[in-house]
């Protein structure tokens, strides 16, 4: 039997009360279940909790970065119902957090920046610096910018900033990519020096990753060049008909990797590590001393394998990178979690290109590899980014790579006296003589 409810009951705030009354009139028996038991029982609910915690932390970080207290946060959101409801939900968390800091006589990083800016503006500190150097400038937040501006207004100095707008991936912590993309609007006439030569990875990977990230027309145009001019395709799909098969095929490829190489398994979210449980040949152990998840592959103890979220992998590199969960799911890669209206209110500058931050995050994931990137994909659930790469480079081209287990080169087809076989592309370069028969049943 259907119970009829109305939208206006939700707007009036008494939907739950009226629904309960209607259910009791139909003699529906109620069973009180503790909320925490529901969340523990259902794994998908744990992801909802993770999503809410992430949203709450982002809102708290953004509001503190903008020097907005709990009451001001509620006031700023009152024109938008959804924003107001979320602000009202987060308000007790923000107050509890602020009270905890006050009672324990502590300050967090946002407080440090705000207090430092206050001291400078009130002439409680005299700036004597002639030069200030800012590293990772693409991650600058509004509070950090205001601090730098206050220092300069107090006593002028020469400012030197190093950053890469393509790697701006910390919006949830308050970073604002416009401070680097529109640098001269914030700091006036400036000299820009471009570092466009890299020693980290091949020209092929540069070409693919650069073209991908510059699909966003707002990103700064660059023409990167590598000292490694290997032009063989550096990105490969590993695609299965379901998630379990995709992970199996990934492990099969890992078994073929050269000896003693380093491997990163990258996830958009921490819980992407759960995908590794699909194959019993993999085991994951959390290293408390380093805060990393080490992965061990049966019969390949020589491989140095680590799981990271893409955010945590920034600044690091491995020989081979496997990017997990390239699916069209809500929590796939790119994530389909949209900015909340409240978050949009707190963001000072527009970054409205579709999936702009996710695109930069995927670029960071691609460029963690020194030699080759493998994209783990499930058939008929390909993410927007995977479809884009397939349309650009062709599905067959992305899937024609086999890794030489001897030198890490590319296995290509040869026609011999006794039939077709796979041989290493580095045969002429370094005389790698590895060959493999072709399994006609595959």
Where are each of the predicted segments found?
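Conserved helicase NTPase motor core
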Residues: 79-179, 197, 315
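Short cysteine-rich clusters marking metal-coordination/redox-active sites
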Residues: 404-407, 424
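Conserved RecA-like helicase ATPase core segment
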Residues: 145-235
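Short metal-binding segments enriched for Cys and/or His
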Residues: 428-442
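Core RecA-like ATPase module of SF1/SF2 helicases and allied nucleic-acid translocases
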Residues: 255-357, 361
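A basic/glycine-biased coupling hinge at the interface between accessory DNA-binding modules
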Residues: 1-107
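C-terminal accessory regions
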Residues: 326-400, 404
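Inter-lobe coupling/hinge region of RecA-like P-loop helicase motors
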Residues: 189-197, 218-267, 305
């Amino acid at each position: 039997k259907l119970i009829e409810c109305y939208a206006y009951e939700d707007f009036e705030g008494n939907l739950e009360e009226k629904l309960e009354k209607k259910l009791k009139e139909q003699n529906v028996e109620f069973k009180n279940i503790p909320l925490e038991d529901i969340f523990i029982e259902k794994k998908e609910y744990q992801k909802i909790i993770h999503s809410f915690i992430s949203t709450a932390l982002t809102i708290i970080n953004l509001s503190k970065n903008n020097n907005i207290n709990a009451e001001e946060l509620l006031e700023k959101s009152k024109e938008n119902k959804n924003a107001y409801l979320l602000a009202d939900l987060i308000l007790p968390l923000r107050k509890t957090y602020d009270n905890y800091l006050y009672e324990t006589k502590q300050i967090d990083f946002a407080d440090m920046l705000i207090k430092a800016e206050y001291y400078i503006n009130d002439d409680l500190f005299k700036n004597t610096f002639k030069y200030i150097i800012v590293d990772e400038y693409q991650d600058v937040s509004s509070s950090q910018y205001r601090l730098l501006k206050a220092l300069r207004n107090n006593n002028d100095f020469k400012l030197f900033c190093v950053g890469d707008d393509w790697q701006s991936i910390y919006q949830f912590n308050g970073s604002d990519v416009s401070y680097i993309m529109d640098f001269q609007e914030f700091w006036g006439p400036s000299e820009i020096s471009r570092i466009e030569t890299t020693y980290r990875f091949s020209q092929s990977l540069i070409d693919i990753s650069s073209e991908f990230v510059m699909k966003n027309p707002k990103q700064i145009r660059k023409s990167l060049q590598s000292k490694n001019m290997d032009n063989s395709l550096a990105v490969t799909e590993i695609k299965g008909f379901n998630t379990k098969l995709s992970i199996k095929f990934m492990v099969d490829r890992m078994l073929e990797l050269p000896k003693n190489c380093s491997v990163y398994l990258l996830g958009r979210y921490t819980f992407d590590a759960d995908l590794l449980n699909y194959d019993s040949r993999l085991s994951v152990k959390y290293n408390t001393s380093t805060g990393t998840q080490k992965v061990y592959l049966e019969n390949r103890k020589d491989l140095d394998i680590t799981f990271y979220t893409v955010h945590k992998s920034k600044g690091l590199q491995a020989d081979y990178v496997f990017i997990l969960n390239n699916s069209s799911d809500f929590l796939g890669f790119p994530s389909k979690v949209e900015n909340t209206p409240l978050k949009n209110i707190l963001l000072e500058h527009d970054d409205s290109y579709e999936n702009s931050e996710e695109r930069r995050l995927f670029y960071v994931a691609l460029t963690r590899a020194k030699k080759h990137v493998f994209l783990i994909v499930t058939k008929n659930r390909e993410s927007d980014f995977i479809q884009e790469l397939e349309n650009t480079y062709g599905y067959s081209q992305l899937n024609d790579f086999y890794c030489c287990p001897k030198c890490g080169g590319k296995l290509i087809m040869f026609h011999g006296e006794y039939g077709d076989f796979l041989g290493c592309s580095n045969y002429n370069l370094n005389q790698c003589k590895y060959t493999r028969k072709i399994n006609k049943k595959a």
